[in-house]
A protein has these predicted regions:
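A short glycine-rich, Lys/Arg-flanked "PGG" loop and its adjoining helix->strand segment in the class I
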Residues: 159-171
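Conserved class I S-adenosyl-L-methionine
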Residues: 7-76
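Short alpha-helix
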Residues: 181-192
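Conserved glycine-rich SAM-binding loop
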Residues: 89
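A short acidic, Gly/Pro-enriched loop at the edge of an enzyme's catalytic core
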Residues: 139-150
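Conserved Class I S-adenosyl-L-methionine
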Residues: 202-256
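Class I SAM-dependent methyltransferase SAM/SAH-binding core
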Residues: 84, 92-139
Length: 256
């Protein structure tokens, strides 16, 4: 299992000591909104990590639409394509692909609260019939062998399970930080038993993005929206892996 960027920290529940709001005089109370932006804001108001909020529904440098479009370059996707977004959180990638291509998508995660949000957002976007979100760990996917044409992930996955559920000739698209500076995409492909089709080093972009998160965290701290401990936590985990030599790769691999 790859879990390289401490990407599970946002699943630690923060006590909800205040009523979720968008601003002065604007309150959601405790009711779920049928507005996409408001529903996401409700979710982020309950999260312990403010640094994830400005990622929006994609929650990760490797899961924004620009980067994801690069990863999908030359990928043939139709309404018949079956896609798994493993460790999907609120399902940003899965829902985006369903909306754009009309394909059937599945997402798995261990956080049922995140999956509730994913289902709510799929309903708001009128794509519920294309999306299925299930509670399951990456190392025990509840799917048959050779099920999916495409598996996508950002950081958290189990390579053996990915290979098992992929159809022969299917694609595994991974966008992830690898903290070992000596490891290469070719070596990773060999380790996972997959054929490397393409790779792109996006470390500079990821570093700049996470540096911006540090600046944002300082502004939040100055505005008394986060405490000193949270600020230090964000600063320690944003760019440190990159300054220590970590590399961020986009890779597309194929099951032989």
């Amino acid at each position: 299992m790859c879990m390289t960027n401490d990407s599970r920290n946002y699943f630690q529940k923060r006590p909800n000591t205040h009523e979720p709001t968008l601003g002065p005089g604007i309150s959601f109370m405790n009711q779920r909104s049928n507005n996409k932006t408001q529903r996401l804001q409700q979710w982020f108001d309950e999260r312990p990590r403010w640094d994830h909020a400005s990622y929006g529904e994609f929650m990760h440098i490797g899961a924004n639409q620009t980067i994801f479009r690069i990863a999908l370059e030359e990928q043939e996707i139709s309404t018949e394509t079956k896609v798994l977004d493993t460790a999907c959180a609120v399902g940003g990638n899965a829902r985006w692909m369903a909306s754009l291509f009309g394909c059937q998508v599945w997402g798995n995660d261990i956080d049922e609260e995140a999956l509730v949000v994913a289902r709510d957002l799929a309903e708001i976007e009128n794509i519920s019939e294309l999306c299925t979100f299930v509670e399951a760990p990456v190392e025990a996917l509840p799917f048959d062998d050779n099920t999916f044409n495409i598996v996508v992930t950002t950081d958290v996955f189990d390579s053996n399970e990915v290979k098992r559920v992929l159809k022969p000739g299917g694609s595994f698209i991974v966008i992830s930080l690898f903290e070992d500076p000596k490891i290469t995409p070719v070596q990773l492909a060999e380790r996972w038993g997959l054929e490397l089709e393409t790779s792109l080093d996006v470390t500079d972009l990821a570093f700049a993005f996470n540096r911006a998160k540090e600046t944002e965290a300082r502004l939040l701290h100055e505005s008394d929206l986060i405490g000193a401990r949270e600020l230090i936590d964000i600063m320690n985990k944003s760019v440190a892996p990159y300054t220590n030599g970590g590399r961020h790769y986009i890779m597309r691999l194929r099951k032989k």
